[in-house]
Amino acid sequence: MKFMLLTLGIVLQLLSFSQDTIIDRGIYQSYYSYSLQQPMYVKYVLWKGGGECSRSKFRFINDTELAMVDNSEYTRSGFDRGHLANAEDFAYDCVKDELTFRYYNCLPQTPNLNRGPWKVWETTIRQESQKDSLLIITGGIWTGTVEKGIQVPTYCWKVVQSLSTLKVTHVLLFTNKINDSVGKEITLAELEKMLKYQVPIRKKKIIKTKK
């Protein structure tokens, strides 16, 4: 099936993959695809993100028995290990921060995306988390592009929902190409049409009861 993304003016063959397992690390959940050997998306809650933890000694690892794209594929591939649950969001706690350095929490991103508009939006959303608790869901869309043995997402996306109002505040779509890393705001309906599945935003507020 083809879907024309009018905001970018491109027609591409969008591929469907299934989420096969959920890797729960407490601070985030990775919805992992065996066929991709990558996460389809990652979900986490952010409240007052940021901090002073030094990440200079942290390295990406695979601490599961699952086969996944890892250091052997990334080395000299030209792609960054693009965090989905952002490391700096958890820099208030080095133990939590280190947990973001997992291969089931990253996608191959071009350097100009990972260090450009992706990073800019990570900073913007972290600033917004100082005033509101946010649900962040972020992942990729694949069209069959294979670079040096890695299935590379053609797009990366990010959805942000306010947990105080349940309003979806951002739906972001980024092209993941060497010379093109445009970020666009689109609608949730447009994104879900591309994904072929519903983004798992929260439908009801969680009411905390006193013990």
PLM regions: where:
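Short, His- and charge-rich active-site/binding loops that engage polyanionic ligands
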Residues: 21-80
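Domain-level detector of nuclease and nuclease-like folds
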Residues: 64-211
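Hydrophobic h-region of N-terminal signal peptides that target proteins for export
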Residues: 4-17
